[in-house]
């Protein structure tokens, strides 16, 4: 029968070891995400998958924040983050650094997540949008591609931290399948 792992069996990295460890070449960009709980959850998932960072834009809350810390469980201390006053500035900086920028949004001519194949030679940035308005159209326009999560229900809407986790995992899954 399966037995739950004890904390000491999980080989968890401390913050210093995490900072020094190689990261997956994926940055999550939060475009005016208003809920500090969503921000904290995204930090926690980015830590779980050892991503390169989280970039916070516009009205998105930034550390230090008691509420971010509560949801992130301290991941805001391990995951590198930057703040930009606009998401457009963040996208421009990412493109200047050679990242492929992918907005996660429901759009005409989007690529379904199930059809997306990453290029292992590329570094990626995922733009996650505001809880009500999604990714701003000017950011979608500036993106290299748009990824859409297939949905079959009545709402066609997912919580931004849940959607971020779904897409992050697909990137991690594909990198692992390539042996990276």
Language-model features: where?
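Post-transcriptional modification and biogenesis factors for structured RNAs
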Residues: 1-180
